[in-house]
Amino acid sequence: LHLLSRRQRQMCIRDSAYNAYDDKRTALYLLNNILGGPGMNSRLNVALRERRGLVYNVESNLTSYTDTGAFCIYFGTDPEDVDTCLKLTYKELKRMRDMKMTSSQLAAAKKQLIGQICVASDNFENNALSMAKTFLHYNKFENLAVVCKRIEALTADDLLEVANEMFAEEYLSTLIYR
């Protein structure tokens, strides 16, 4: 048996999240996209990777099930940068809890998420899976226009409320894989 030396530390910060039937899940999806979504402009990517070069990859993800949900922030970093990365991550979460988004920030975030959804909807397999999942959960089909309308209806107050419910440090668990 040969054990490999792992230089990097893998981090996971997580919390339970809204289930698939909770109306607040749309606001959390938008917050998730702003915080650590696939765009290079996500807040965690800018804070940890672009400004400081502390991580190669940082992302957050959200999964909603019928009875619960899961929210997770993931990144890998060098052992000496773990504390700095954690402090910066919690600083971004606090910023999302304390500062209401401006109307231009909110509009840009909505536009980005809707754009990502539209691009994903060009894939027939993604469309079929999405329709099947929606029908199984809700016994109805929501087309792209309905989803976009739900995102467009979100307000800065909605996001602030959800950020305060979801991103409080006392509810988050941190796992460091060595």
Model-inferred region functions:
Residues 29, 159, 174:
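Short, conserved catalytic/metal-binding micro-motifs enriched in Asp/Glu and His
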Residues 1-12:
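Single conserved hydrophobic/aromatic residue that forms the stacking wall/gate
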Residues 155-164:
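Low-complexity, intrinsically disordered Gly/Pro/Thr-rich segments
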